[in-house]
């Protein structure tokens, strides 16, 4: 669009950090969420209209730095919300909040764009029957299964394997479901974004030789960017994911890292716009903003968007309004444990702390439910006995408790699994384990059929047959 021919032109009356006020003389004001274009010293600056102030004035939040802007500079109404490229050409590329490539690989040859502000799917278009989203990762599928079109919270500190788990999920959805993934980096460190990109290229998730064969599109709005960009980058990633779901009719994985930063950016913008703060200084519109994002993440008759959201919990306070509002939308939680990572058990998913609303007999079936409950009971009993073992030794336990400990240690090791994306580091070929094989394997351990096998045979294997074969090599 040639904005020079656009007759809806205003000028800046005030600049306060990333917020600009503009007055439009024509009386035809830009609509809320319209993108405004301002000529900055390093090229055009895009702002988004947030408030209509009266007297032909609007207040907008900038998506990039406002350095060098002055009163009286012309402002052009683009007469449309921020729109971003969508489709297969986004795969293997990195974009900013405006959908502009930032990986120095040139423009995307996409003619299709969509506005980032869209309505959630109509109720009649939703797929309401709960279905499990099989990941091929034993610990997830058995103990905290993901819902197709659901929202999963990913909890874990630094260095416990979040990135590797995310990359394995991206790999598995592409291979097993023919789906694609979109990664939204919201307000996290630029270094982490760069590391993730490099690791994705190493593991083959991004195919450098043929970008269209890549399995993921990346959208970054990092913590050095203005709050407007961090607040909207999640919507940019979601819009790209919606296209794959609605037009390409694919299953999509949407990663948001970190959903707390989305709330934090909204809080900054709210204060800059002069709104009265709510509890703990958060924006009064916290629930509305979170709902507008989360309600668009769902299964429809066409396809699904399953979202995995890293959740930072400020000061480990789960009652803080930001994580508390997020929990209301989650169907499952995957908690990564530093203790398991220290033992070398990867993925370091905590089997007792991770939860899922899908783990009900009516949804997963009686066999799956009973197996999962027995696994949790065995691991919980082992956890209770660990203090006694540490003080008195395992010989002081009853015969029954010794058997529980023996099986729990096998279960703990069998919950580990070699990943495809970690082949480069471990040298072990990755394994995708279907749900039926997972349930069968744990039932055999719980039933005592494998009591004579050494526990190290269960470490970093795929299905139970591999563990049995591995045990034979120890005997030889």
Curated annotation (Swiss-Prot):
<dbReference type="GO" id="GO:0016887">
    <property type="term" value="F:ATP hydrolysis activity"/>
</dbReference>
<dbReference type="GO" id="GO:0045259">
    <property type="term" value="C:proton-transporting ATP synthase complex"/>
</dbReference>
<keyword id="KW-0406">Ion transport</keyword>
<keyword id="KW-0150">Chloroplast</keyword>
<comment type="similarity">
    <text>Belongs to the ATPase alpha/beta chains family.</text>
</comment>
<dbReference type="Pfam" id="PF02874">
    <property type="entry name" value="ATP-synt_ab_N"/>
</dbReference>
<dbReference type="InterPro" id="IPR024034">
    <property type="entry name" value="ATPase_F1/V1_b/a_C"/>
</dbReference>
<keyword id="KW-0472">Membrane</keyword>
<keyword id="KW-0139">CF(1)</keyword>
<comment type="function">
    <text>Produces ATP from ADP in the presence of a proton gradient across the membrane. The catalytic sites are hosted primarily by the beta subunits.</text>
</comment>
<keyword id="KW-0547">Nucleotide-binding</keyword>
<keyword id="KW-0375">Hydrogen ion transport</keyword>
<dbReference type="Pfam" id="PF00006">
    <property type="entry name" value="ATP-synt_ab"/>
</dbReference>
<keyword id="KW-0934">Plastid</keyword>
<protein>
    <recommendedName>
        <fullName>ATP synthase subunit beta, chloroplastic</fullName>
        <ecNumber>7.1.2.2</ecNumber>
    </recommendedName>
</protein>
<dbReference type="InterPro" id="IPR000194">
    <property type="entry name" value="ATPase_F1/V1/A1_a/bsu_nucl-bd"/>
</dbReference>
<dbReference type="InterPro" id="IPR055190">
    <property type="entry name" value="ATP-synt_VA_C"/>
</dbReference>
<dbReference type="GO" id="GO:0046933">
    <property type="term" value="F:proton-transporting ATP synthase activity, rotational mechanism"/>
</dbReference>
<comment type="subunit">
    <text>F-type ATPases have 2 components, CF(1) - the catalytic core - and CF(0) - the membrane proton channel. CF(1) has five subunits: alpha(3), beta(3), gamma(1), delta(1), epsilon(1). CF(0) has four main subunits: a(1), b(1), b'(1) and c(9-12).</text>
</comment>
<dbReference type="InterPro" id="IPR003593">
    <property type="entry name" value="AAA+_ATPase"/>
</dbReference>
<dbReference type="InterPro" id="IPR036121">
    <property type="entry name" value="ATPase_F1/V1/A1_a/bsu_N_sf"/>
</dbReference>
<dbReference type="Pfam" id="PF22919">
    <property type="entry name" value="ATP-synt_VA_C"/>
</dbReference>
<dbReference type="GO" id="GO:0005739">
    <property type="term" value="C:mitochondrion"/>
</dbReference>
<dbReference type="InterPro" id="IPR027417">
    <property type="entry name" value="P-loop_NTPase"/>
</dbReference>
<dbReference type="InterPro" id="IPR004100">
    <property type="entry name" value="ATPase_F1/V1/A1_a/bsu_N"/>
</dbReference>
<dbReference type="GO" id="GO:0042776">
    <property type="term" value="P:proton motive force-driven mitochondrial ATP synthesis"/>
</dbReference>
<dbReference type="GO" id="GO:0005524">
    <property type="term" value="F:ATP binding"/>
</dbReference>
<dbReference type="GO" id="GO:0009535">
    <property type="term" value="C:chloroplast thylakoid membrane"/>
</dbReference>
<dbReference type="InterPro" id="IPR020003">
    <property type="entry name" value="ATPase_a/bsu_AS"/>
</dbReference>
<dbReference type="InterPro" id="IPR050053">
    <property type="entry name" value="ATPase_alpha/beta_chains"/>
</dbReference>
<keyword id="KW-0793">Thylakoid</keyword>
<keyword id="KW-0813">Transport</keyword>
<keyword id="KW-0066">ATP synthesis</keyword>
<keyword id="KW-1278">Translocase</keyword>
<feature type="binding site">
    <location>
        <begin position="156"/>
        <end position="163"/>
    </location>
    <ligand>
        <name>ATP</name>
    </ligand>
</feature>
<keyword id="KW-0067">ATP-binding</keyword>
<dbReference type="InterPro" id="IPR005722">
    <property type="entry name" value="ATP_synth_F1_bsu"/>
</dbReference>
């Amino acid at each position: 669009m040639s904005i020079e021919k656009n007759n809806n032109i205003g000028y800046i009356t005030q600049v306060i950090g990333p917020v600009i006020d503009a007055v439009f003389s024509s009386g035809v004001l830009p609509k809320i969420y319209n993108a405004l274009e301002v000529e900055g010293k390093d090229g055009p600056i895009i702002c988004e209209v947030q408030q209509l102030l009266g007297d032909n004035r609007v207040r907008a939040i900038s998506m990039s730095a406002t350095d060098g802007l002055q009163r009286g500079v012309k402002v052009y109404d683009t007469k449309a919300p921020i729109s971003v490229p969508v489709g297969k050409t986004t795969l293997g590329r990195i974009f900013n909040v405006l959908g502009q490539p930032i990986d120095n690989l040139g423009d995307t040859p996409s003619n299709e764009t969509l506005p980032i502000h869209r309505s959630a799917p109509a109720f009649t278009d939703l797929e309401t029957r709960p279905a499990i989203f099989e990941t091929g990762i034993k610990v997830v599928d058995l103990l905290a299964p993901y819902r197709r079109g659901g929202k999963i919270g990913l909890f874990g500190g630094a260095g416990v394997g979040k990135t590797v788990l995310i990359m394995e999920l991206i790999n598995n959805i592409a291979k097993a479901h023919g789906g694609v993934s979109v990664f939204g980096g919201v307000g996290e460190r630029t270094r982490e974004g760069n590391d993730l990109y490099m690791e994705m290229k190493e593991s083959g998730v991004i195919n450098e030789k043929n970008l269209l064969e890549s399995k993921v599109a990346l959208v970054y709005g990092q913590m050095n960017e203005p709050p407007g960009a961090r607040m909207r980058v999640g919507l940019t990633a979601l819009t790209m994911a919606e296209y794959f779901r609605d037009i390409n009719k694919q299953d999509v994985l949407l990663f948001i890292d970190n959903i707390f930063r989305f709330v934090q950016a909204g809080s900054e913008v709210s204060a800059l716009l002069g709104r009265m703060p709510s509890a703990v200084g958060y924006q009064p519109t916290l629930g509305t903003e979170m709902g507008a994002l989360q309600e668009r993440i769902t299964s429809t008759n066409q396809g699904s968007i399953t979202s995995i959201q890293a959740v930072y919990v400020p000061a480990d306070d789960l009652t803080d309004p930001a994580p508390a509002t997020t929990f209301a939308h989650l169907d499952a939680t995957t908690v990564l444990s530093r203790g398991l990572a220290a033992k070398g058990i990867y993925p370091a998913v905590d089997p007792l702390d991770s939860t899922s609303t899908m783990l009900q007999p009516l949804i997963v079936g009686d066999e799956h439910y009973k197996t999962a409950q027995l696994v949790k009971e065995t691991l919980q009993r082992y956890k209770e006995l660990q203090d006694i073992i540490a003080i008195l030794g395992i010989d002081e336990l009853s015969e029954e408790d010794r058997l529980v400990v023996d099986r729990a240690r096998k279960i703990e090791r069998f919950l580990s699994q070699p990943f495809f994306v970690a082949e480069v580091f471990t040298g072990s070929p990755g394994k995708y384990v279907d749900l039926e094989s997972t349930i069968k394997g744990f039932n055999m351990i719980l039933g005592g059929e494998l009591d004579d096998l050494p526990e190290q045979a269960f470490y970093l294997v795929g299905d139970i047959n591999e563990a049995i074969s591995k045990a034979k090599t120890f005997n030889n």
